[in-house]
Amino acid sequence: MLTETPLAAQLAAQRDDRLRVLIVGAGIAGITLAQLLRRDGLHPVLVDRMPVMEHPGYMLALMPTVDQAFVDLGVHTEYRDAGTPMARYAFRSHRGRLLRTDSMSELLSVYGEYNGISRGALIEVLTAHGCPVTFGTTVDAVAEGTARFVRPDGAPASEAAFDLIIGADGIRSRMRDVLGAGAPDAVETGWSGWVAWAEDLGDPALGEELWGDGFFLGVYPVKDRLGVFLGGPDAALADGPAAFAGSVRNRVDELGPRLSAAVAAVAADPDPYLWRLDDARVPRWVLPHGVLLGDAAAGFLPTAGIGAGMAIESAWMLARMLRQADRAVLADVLEAWERAERPRVEAAQSNSRMLAKLMFRRGRLVAWLRETVMRMLSVRAALGPILKLVASRPDPDAIAREARNATFTAAPPAGHRADT
């Protein structure tokens, strides 16, 4: 569980660490990195500007690329138990007719499972052994390794020096400006959607999507229930979820009991979470004053179901590489991490952007053409670039060793032989 901890106590705990690490943002990427570093004996300071953890949560589908992070944390069994495999994926026409069903388990069986899990359950798994965090605190300036902590209202809180400062504060990151990343390359689709939860009526291993004319409906299994996403152009959502859900029902011939219950769940929720369908990426993750991680570095559209998984992978890669880092080699290890991981994340993000071009288009002719393509295009073909990433995960230990050896070869520190 997340444990509210005074900032002074976190700072005191890391006083003798070989690397003093600050993580700004207690989302999935920030928590994953903090917990992995703690498992390795460090005491990273973790802060979040929110006064309490109040994120309402949504559903996630995680590729097998995340599994090693849970193994390293000693919670892989808990992770498996908290989710449910999404074994099959079904695609429906804009009128609701089933067009095709593909096996996800056959697609990924060599590597693992495509696991459906709620965000809340995922955070419970990641923090199962306790996770100190200071809420109501963020950073508004960094200079020569010293971070200035402030309250959400801007009131000063403290200052402290660190060897590594990491911005993991989400897709609308403020740490981008603090660390000098500049404006991100962003895709603003003009679409949003509501997230709700529904009972699973009969098929807990099936994910379904209906790409309609001016709307999108998806249902995704998590443990004991379905995560529902119902979205459309922002202007069409102006009258609220119940009205939009009603308009969707009027445009579809065949929903069936499962999708009908999903639409009803959105309409009945008094305050469903609204998810804006935008993305963002920065050209560099390693910056003069720190590092960006997760959505702060590359925030995804949810069209390929890979964003959270890549955030976890990036955090795991960084944590494993920091095992072999000290202050003398830190800069080279960070550069090596970015060289290895950023192209993978950007390839996955580009795949999400490609699918978005299919999804976020209106008109019956467009819907018909899209369905013609999707009827012939298997999930294997649609997610081809992502499957390549699953099959070719880099070795962080080898990359870190190479970076460390290169540092010592270029400029051996006193008392160190470059050939040892």
Where do the language-model regions lie?
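FAD/FMN-dependent oxidoreductases across multiple families
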Residues: 213, 223, 232-304, 310
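C-terminal helical "tail/cap" subdomain of flavin- and related membrane-associated enzymes
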Residues: 1-19, 96, 304-305, 320-420
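Flavin-dependent oxidoreductases
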Residues: 189-220
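Conserved N-terminal helical subregion
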Residues: 2-21, 36-38, 63-179, 184-197, ...
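Conserved N-terminal glycine-rich FAD pyrophosphate-binding loop of Rossmann-like flavoproteins
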Residues: 52-68
